[in-house]
Amino acid sequence: MSPLECSECFGDQLLHKTYTWHLTLHSRPNFTRKRDTRSESLEIPVNVILPQRGTEPFLRLHNLYSTPRCSRQAALPRMSRRVASQHSYPLNRFSSMPFDPMERPTSQADLELDYNPPRVQLSDEMFVFQDGRWVNESCRLQPPYFSPPSSFHHKLHHRRLAKEYQLQEENKSLRDENRALRDENKALRKENKILQVFWEEHKVTLGHEESQTSSLLHKDTTSQEVVKRDNTTLPAQRSKESTLQLIREENRALQQLLEQRQAYWAQAEENAASTEEGKSTSSPKEESHNSGLLPDQSTNHSSPFEDPKVPPTTQEDSKTLRALREMVNNLSGASGEEDGKVGPNLPDSAQPLQLLREMNQALQALQEENRLLQEENRALHILREEHRVFQEENKALWENNKLKLQQRLVIDTVTEVTARMEMLIEELYAFMPAKNNKDPKKPSRV
């Protein structure tokens, strides 16, 4: 049973399209001998089978006709050794291979047809067309060796159908799994969207709570910071106020001391002048009589600072001195405390002297600073004068440059005008007629 009539594999009677072409091989004449100019031809049918179900096309060369098709073919003699063609490469290279390497072509002997393979004699050898290629007749294989059994084609096709069926089943199962996975993916996306909405709502509520707690914490922290600042600024403000108050009291005390000293020194000078006048007028007798009273007077007038007429001034001086020393001790550190300890041990007569010395030192320092400031002020005045002088010089130079530029412009315009006038005069004299062949005198330049 041939594959063209197989109903078990394909289910139809006509499942292949068969196309047949006839190849005609013409042999050239052999010109080695002058008399032999004959040419012979050989006709070979080519059968091409195109299957319709899943198989691939392949080419077969067969001699489908046991008898010659026409009288001309029957009349053709066999190719002899003498007229054989020298060129055998078309026959040696011409082969028939199936397009599918898994399928072996079915020979015409397997199809149980009458089969006479074509033969060609080239040179001394005979070639037979067997299984799609030209084979030497001496090396020709027997049909049981090279031809597959008749059931090979059916088994191969059944295997292919089984593989295709398995692949289709696998594709169906994979499609079902893909659909199930898509459905699960859709459900998970919906759940994800719902969870995102819930999370945003929860986030908003958490943000409100955090803002409330943060506002409360911020208020608490601000109140604590304000309290801390107050606590830190209060002693600083108190210390500043105390120092300012001490400085004010010190200034007032210094002013009072200066006023008292001025009045005291003026009164002392008057007393000294009156005593000198009294001494000059008094006689030596009176001095001898009053010698007993001199020690008392000397004791009473031992220091110029002890004036019996002005007892409250000394008390005020001592009070102010003590206040000043206390302020100095408060402002200065341990050195001031040591001075305060030593100060009260001094006698009352030395306290105003020490105060005057300190005031004198302060005044000298202030005078030195004032002198330095005056020198700086003088230097600044000198610099201002120099700057003013430089400005005046720059202004004068700028005016001078401006005048020079104007002068240059005027000179350039005058030269240009004179040049044009000369050109015009020359043109006028050129147009004027000559008189007695005398050259006209050119006018002088303006």
Curated annotation (Swiss-Prot):
Residues 208-231, 276-289 have a biased composition (Basic and acidic residues). Testis-specific. Expression is restricted to the flower-like structure in spermatids. The modification Phosphoserine is found at S41, S85, S88, S96, S123, S147, S211, S223, S274, S332, S335. Residues 208-243, 268-317 are annotated as: Disordered. Keywords: Coiled coil, Phosphoprotein. InterPro entries: Chibby_fam. The keyword Coiled coil applies. GO terms for cellular component: cytoplasmic vesicle. Residues 161-197, 236-264, 353-411 form a coiled coil. CDD domains: Cby_like. Disulfide bonds: none annotated. Homodimer. Binds to NEK1. Belongs to the chibby family. SPERT subfamily. This is Protein chibby homolog 2. The gene is Cby2.
